[in-house]
Amino acid sequence: MNRKVILLCLIFLVPKDSLQIGKKECIVDLQKTTCFQHPESDLFEKAVVCIKKYEGWHSLKHFPYVGYGHRLLKEEAFDHRISEKFADSILRKDLRLKCELFRDFGSDSLILGTLAYNVGEYRLLGFGKKQKSTLIRKLEKGNRKIYDDYIAFCHYKGKVVPSIKKRRMEEYRLLFNCKNINNKSYDKCR
């Protein structure tokens, strides 16, 4: 009986969340996300600021999106009338979850998580008949020349959207480190 109580206490001490990818549910330990050892690091903060800048505030007309682009889930009991502080905490939680999906990419998990926050992880990782993106395939092979592939995520209905292209360029500039990855130095990443 004491073991059950201790186990329950341990479960509640470690913040966890879950997300569904296709039909699989992933349990994520938010303290072990690999965006960075300290998720409130400078780069994580830059990502949050960048997302806020380009997402803007989502009001009732943006339903089912609230705050800074959070998509409401069926079980969530709030709407667009949330505080900025609450929206900030949701953004950070969502970004950590996205980063966790890309944990195998090490320090690139932040830029990939930031992109997935906007376009969805399926566009990067593939799902069903949709293949992995060229961006992911290049990074898996160790190819750091991903600028064009990253910026290419700026289309809507087949057309380049200048504001989204500007966003991608800023995200890349702020968050992608092409040098000294895995003890290798890369002179050019474009």
Explain the meaning of each model-derived region.
Residues 2, 7-57, 70-75, 82-101, ...:
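Long, amphipathic alpha-helical surface segments
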Residues 46, 61-63, 107:
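Extracytoplasmic
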Residues 61-63, 114, 165:
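N-terminal hydrophobic or amphipathic segments with adjacent small-residue motifs
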Residues 62-63, 76-79:
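Short, glycine/acidic-enriched capping/hinge loops at junctions between secondary-structure elements
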Residues 63-66, 70:
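Early exported N-terminus immediately downstream of N-terminal targeting peptides
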Residues 102-108:
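Structural motif
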Residues 109-123:
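Short N-proximal segments of mature Sec-exported proteins
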